[in-house]
Amino acid sequence: MSAQISDSIEEKRGFFTRWFMSTNHKDIGVLYLFTAGLAGLISVTLTVYMRMELQHPGVQYMCLEGMRLVADAAAECTPNAHLWNVVVTYHGILMMFFVVIPALFGGFGNYFMPLHIGAPDMAFPRLNNLSYWLYVCGVSLAIASLLSPGGSDQPGAGVGWVLYPPLSTTEAGYAMDLAIFAVHVSGATSILGAINIITTFLNMRAPGMTLFKVPLFAWAVFITAWMILLSLPVLAGGITMLLMDRNFGTQFFDPAGGGDPVLYQHILWFFGHPEVYMLILPGFGIISHVISTFARKPIFGYLPMVLAMAAIAFLGFIVWAHHMYTAGMSLTQQTYFQMATMTIAVPTGIKVFSWIATMWGGSIEFKTPMLWALAFLFTVGGVTGVVIAQGSLDRVYHDTYYIVAHFHYVMSLGALFAIFAGTYYWIGKMSGRQYPEWAGQLHFWMMFIGSNLIFFPQHFLGRQGMPRRYIDYPVEFSYWNNISSIGAYISFASFLFFIGIVFYTLFAGKPVNVPNYWNEHADTLEWTLPSPPPEHTFETLPKPEDWDRAQAHR
């Protein structure tokens, strides 16, 4: 994506200086989005390979005799369980640490949060540059880990993305150590970004922009930054203990030496459950702006929406052990975590019903971003989450495909759909060129149908008792697995089509000649700027009359 060059010094910058040494928040946001897209392509490819293997009973592709891309019934195939575990592990690690948070928080957050509050840039521009390049190092370490010697004398670490001991402490090779370092570096870049976001939000708002006149996306990114700042150091401590157990003879998680592997589960999930909301809260902000724009109405209940996000963030820190009902806990503990978990449905419901109220009576325009917002099926994942909040039911569904379906309705049809909504909503603003509407809508329908075909049948597989993370299964599970795999192929084709749409838009899309190419209800400050925005924005700070009429939330 290009940005307008405002003076002769900037015109002399080459490609390397512009993109590798930039401290401009807009350039860094674009870099985050581009790198997250590459990591996402790798992760989605691993997903398709998993679904190829699971389409039919028996092992056809992941063989000890060698990986295959075409099934050969006549050739011998000894199941390669390590390869399967590696594919599952790196799909999770890449998606959780290197795709969704960097795209929503690092990409859209860096680009639009300063614009929404009228700030010239981030508070610490050089720190912003450092956090991006640490992110690149983290992605590189993760890919290096995938290709490095691991267990069973094969590449990669096959322990699952949660890195549970004793699997992670006994896995041979240094692929496991590189994976832990990759997560460490990912945490460092997120913490640095969070410090920058918090400082910018609190200190660089436009004159007269009080806290409760800040747009919802900026609020979402700000609250997410606090969650990152409070939870990631806990994970850092846990995986540091893993490294110590692996390399320095400590026994934090080894029962033979007085350690406790369940301690790691508490550490991981104290970070892991807030992470779910770190992934989804920026998406909430994007969806709020998209719905308000295309319903042609101000968002309903602005203040309750802000308070609901803050409540979700707070409650996210006190429900972690609902992931651990089967690890053993007292009835009193289980009762508390059940009640606390179900309480999160209240602020989440406030957001969902506020979106519905915003659309009610509005003049809805079904452009591509609005389609993604309407298909934002986080609610389905939330409803199934209330189901498995019950300890008695969770004992039945734990480690079955019901959990896979629940989680991916939150992540894939939640956070990922929010990324697509934000991309189509803002790509014209970022690039100065607009996507073809027919192509965006075709991509939406392909992805919507494909994603639901993947994950909705997995609820049935879970109810039938199919365990997750298995390379093979009895023939009784074949019907829904076949449908799920067909959905994966459709979704993968739609993702490749999306990449084509992005490149077509950047190089041949219809030029955007107006600041606001949607309507008057796209009312945040970026819509007062040219498309694309100039290299330096708000060198003269916006006055209240520039934004207050549009931001008068009551």
UniProtKB/Swiss-Prot annotation:
Pathway: Energy metabolism; oxidative phosphorylation. Its cofactor is Cu(2+); heme. Fe(II)-heme a binds at H91, H408. Cu cation binds at H273, Y277, H322, H323. It catalyses: 4 Fe(II)-[cytochrome c] + O2 + 8 H(+)(in) = 4 Fe(III)-[cytochrome c] + 2 H2O + 4 H(+)(out). Binds 1 copper B ion per subunit. Binds 2 heme groups per subunit. It is found in: Cell inner membrane. Belongs to the heme-copper respiratory oxidase family. This is Cytochrome c oxidase subunit 1-alpha.
